[in-house]
Amino acid sequence: MTEVKAELVGSVWKITAKSGDEVAEDDVLMILESMKMEISVTAPRAGKVLEIRVKETDVVKEGQVLVVLE
């Protein structure tokens, strides 16, 4: 399992992946908004999305787990 974590404090603007999706390395999983900038959260490797631990509009902290890949 691989945990994809937030690299900064921000809010979840849009989630583009869902549980069960097969993703490739560097696929965009979600977009965070921080200080009026959009930051793409990408898959660090290919795999299957097991769990998305946030929802749109959630405020996330640096280091918070956003997505779990199989």
Language-model features and meaning:
Residues 24-39, 61-70:
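Short hydrophobic beta/alpha edge segments that flank linear recognition/processing sites
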